[in-house]
Curated annotation (Swiss-Prot):
Key component of the proton channel; it plays a direct role in the translocation of protons across the membrane. It is found in: Cell membrane. Its main location: membrane. This is ATP synthase subunit a. It comes from Staphylococcus epidermidis (strain ATCC 35984 / DSM 28319 / BCRC 17069 / CCUG 31568 / BM 3577 / RP62A). NCBIfam families: ATP_synt_6_or_A, PRK05815.1-4.
């Protein structure tokens, strides 16, 4: 079944800027959930961690491993909290659309994974790429940073600049494509259950169970890949050899 998106358009200086209210809502919900998770896991910290403290410390150690695989910790440590926040946000965002969807009587879809919207994922990727430029200039200086685009020889400058755009697109669209495809198939299986009650459940229920499990795996891997590539791009900008 086709679903509509709750769109609102604002005219700014003659340009129509369109917002998907469902995506905005889900981004806010994701941010709130990550904030609550961080508060809960960091309350009453102990020298001998247990339970939730063990979990959050494992996340920090795991992300530190990602960073250290790409750059020295002396520089990479500056991005530790950024990377932890990013992986938690994307993981939670990827999971939100899996248990259920909320669709109103007019077939407007309100509850979904925000990362199933290309606008959200491209915004995330653009933000990360811009941050790599910011920290590259901040940590290396404008002259050294700009000179990196002309290495190993100056004709590569055009290719290096073009690579920034392709990196942004691939980083965002990879995440979007995987999450959108997963939720699309879940929707098809769910519609089969409701629209073909005589035999649809025979296919849809086992299919939903298997695909839910696979989608959790894919959502987790995609959060890891996004953060890993973000740190790869960051290391290229802040490393002295760039």
């Amino acid at each position: 079944m086709d679903h509509k998106s709750p769109l609102v358009s604002w005219n700014v200086f003659g340009f129509d800027i369109v917002f998907n209210l469902a995506s905005v809502l889900m981004v806010v919900i994701t941010a709130i959930l990550v904030f609550i998770l961080a508060i809960v896991c960091t309350r009453n910290l102990k020298k001998r961690p247990t339970g939730k403290q063990n979990f959050i410390e494992w996340v920090f150690d795991f992300v530190r491993g990602i960073i250290e695989s790409n750059m020295a910790w002396k520089k990479g440590g500056n991005f530790h909290f950024l990377a932890v926040t990013l992986i938690l946000f994307i993981f939670v965002a990827n999971m939100l659309g899996l248990p259920f969807a909320i669709v109103t009587h007019d077939h407007t879809l309100w509850w979904k994974s925000p990362t199933a919207d290309a606008t959200v994922t491209l915004t995330l990727s653009t933000t990360m790429i811009l941050l790599t430029h910011y920290y590259g200039i901040k940590m290396r200086g404008t002259k050294a940073y700009a000179a990196g685009y002309f290495k190993p020889f100056w004709p590569l400058a055009i290719i290096n600049v073009f690579e920034e755009f392709t990196s942004t697109l691939t980083l965002g669209l990879r995440l979007y494509g995987n999450i959108f495809a997963g939720e699309l198939l879940l929707g098809l299986l769910a519609s089969l259950f409701f629209e073909q009650p005589a035999w649809g459940w025979i296919i849809s229920i086992p299919g939903l169970i298997v695909w839910q499990a696979f989608s959790i795996f894919v959502g987790t891997i995609q959060a890891y890949i996004f953060v890993m590539l973000s740190m790869v791009y960051m290391s290229h900008k802040v490393a002295d050899g760039h």
